[in-house]
Regions:
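The structured alpha-helical core of multi-pass membrane proteins
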Residues: 291, 372, 486-489
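Conserved RecA-like P-loop NTPase helicase motor core
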Residues: 264-283, 339-468
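Conserved NTP-handling cores and scaffolds of large molecular machines
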Residues: 10-13, 33, 37, 66, ...
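Surface-exposed flexible segments
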Residues: 4, 381-388, 474-483
């Protein structure tokens, strides 16, 4: 079995075995089930009617929990005990295993959703031909949610030891949700591995270096052998090391086709520190904008900039668009250098944005594309040749370590490491690596959007003081590490700009 794009395999397995349900979905499914029960109550056999009533009770219990949590807690999220979700009237008497068996065998969700859709279509036809008068109320078509709810109920029946339930508020604070998250993909992937004669994980960006690898793989002895240990520790921890082989290849381009800088300071000498506490500084954001102006002046064609999040990108753009007196704002000045485009979190067409960006480059204006790590532009889109003469990464996109979900993930990894015989320090290192590798895998994936063939060339600019630390450098792909400018921390911003100027002049002359 060969799995391509395997940098996604852990997240894919986790996502498949995770599920989220909102209070609004619970209410909608409860209402749909109520309509169905009222219509067919007399046709349902006694046993079926009992099971349907049990589903109603279970939905009421989950909805009541969310409503109580919404009213009595200010927390954005927290871990939830399974028992707390099953305290509704009569719920303790429900055999969840029998109920789930009934739902699967009877296909109740499909029947309810089919009836609701059919009833709505029939009502529309009656109104259109004048058989009944519209009631004046604007009703939205029912969304088939009971099948989704059934999936959540299945996790209540048999939650995995490595899974957790969470309560969370929606981003707009208009809804509350229950989440079930798989924290560790090992056991689910093991089922796949044991059915195969051999398994190959292949990918272009699979190498955040795990310092924790020494716990299990010191026998490998070479740096490249340890590069993929993050995957090994989380997918093959049950296998002896002699059954595992790793191979890390270099890039197809010659060394002279890449210049990579960890950029520590901006043009004014202000240190680039895009940690969560510091990155909101107006001075820092202005320094970033002025730095981009200088870079865009010497980098030809297309420049792609990746920000840690949509929220931070919005904040930066808002600051750059502020005007002081009659002087031009940073946003306008950037627009004079290159046509500026930005990725939107909304369902705006990626194709349209890319087409406009490409067109601006073809016309000689050049393009500056502001994107987000982990967003629509960071994977599956190739910025080859003129589309990506520079990739700039602003800061490090660490996930929120204070979130209940990440606390649970780290705690689980630390405990699993200890259970396998790891020392307390090794357990802590495993949790830290999980957190750092999640960040660096996203960074490496974004960097990999440029330089797509042997004759391609580009610059990689990593804007943050932390990119000069050995821990972070070792989590970059080998071909990037080899291209990093030495002693970059000691070099002024002007030296970096001069290096870029010389690099692109040399390439354009060949």
């Amino acid at each position: 079995m060969i799995i391509d794009e395997a940098h996604n395999v852990m997240d894919a397995i986790t996502s498949i075995h995770s599920i989220t349900i909102s209070l609004s979905q619970l209410k909608r499914s409860r209402a749909q089930l109520g309509v169905y029960l009222q219509k067919f109550r007399n046709r349902l056999k006694g046993k079926n009617r009992v099971y349907v009533t049990q589903v109603v009770r279970l939905l009421d219990s989950l909805a009541a929990y969310l409503q109580n949590k919404e009213a009595n807690t200010k927390q954005g999220e927290c871990i939830v005990k399974t028992a707390d979700l099953l305290v509704g009237k009569g719920v303790d008497q429900i055999n969840l295993y029998k109920l789930m068996h009934y739902l699967e065998e009877s296909k109740l969700a499909r029947k309810v959703e089919g009836y609701i859709i059919d009833a709505e279509e029939r009502e529309k036809k009656e109104v259109s031909v004048g058989l009944r008068q519209p009631d004046g109320k604007k009703t939205e078509p029912s969304v088939p949610v009971l099948t989704h709810v059934q999936g959540f109920l299945a996790t209540l029946t048999d939650p995995a030891p490595e899974g957790r339930f969470f309560f969370e508020r929606s981003e707009d604070d208009k809804d509350v949700r229950l989440k079930y998250r798989l924290l560790d993909p090992t056991h689910h992937f093991q089922e796949i591995v044991e059915d195969a004669r051999a398994v190959i994980l292949a990918g272009g960006t699979m190498s955040p270096v795990s310092l924790y690898s020494k716990l299990r793989f010191s026998c490998y002895g070479t740096h490249h052998d340890r590069q993929m240990s993050d995957y090994v520790n989380r997918l093959f921890s049950y296998l002896p090391s002699e059954r595992l082989t790793t191979l890390s290849c270099g890039h197809v381009i010659p060394a002279g086709n890449l210049v990579a800088w960890p950029v520590m300071k901006g043009p004014s000498g202000i240190e680039y520190d895009f940690t969560f506490d510091q990155r909101k500084s107006s001075t820092m954001v202005d320094e970033l904008g002025i730095g981009l102006l200088s870079m865009c002046h010497v980098i030809p064609d297309g420049v792609v900039v990746f920000f840690p999040s949509y929220a931070y990108l919005d904040q930066v753009v808002q600051r750059w668009q502020m005007r002081t007196g009659t002087s031009k704002c940073i946003w306008d000045r950037l627009g004079e250098k290159k046509a500026v485009f930005r990725e939107s979190k909304e369902n705006a067409s990626v194709e349209d944005t890319l087409q406009q960006y490409s067109s601006a480059i073809d016309k000689g204006k050049g393009g500056l594309l502001l994107s987000v790590v982990g967003g629509k532009m960071s994977e599956g889109i190739n910025f080859s040749d003129r589309l990506g003469r520079a990739v700039i990464v602003v800061g490090l996109p660490y996930p929120n370590i204070h979130s209940s979900e990440w606390k649970a993930k780290i705690e689980h990894v630390e405990k699993s490491t200890a259970d396998r015989g790891g020392s307390p320090s090794e357990s802590k290192a495993a949790g830290r690596d999980l957190y750092e590798n999640s960040c660096m895998r996203a960074v490496n994936q974004s960097i990999g959007r440029a330089i797509r063939h042997q004759n391609d060339y580009a610059s990689i600019l990593l804007l943050d003081r932390r990119y000069d630390t050995e821990r972070i450098k070792r989590k970059l792909p080998g071909w990037i590490r080899q291209g990093l400018v030495q002693d970059a921390a000691r070099q002024p911003f002007t030296e970096m700009v001069g290096s870029l100027t010389a690099f692109f002049r040399a390439k354009e002359a060949t």
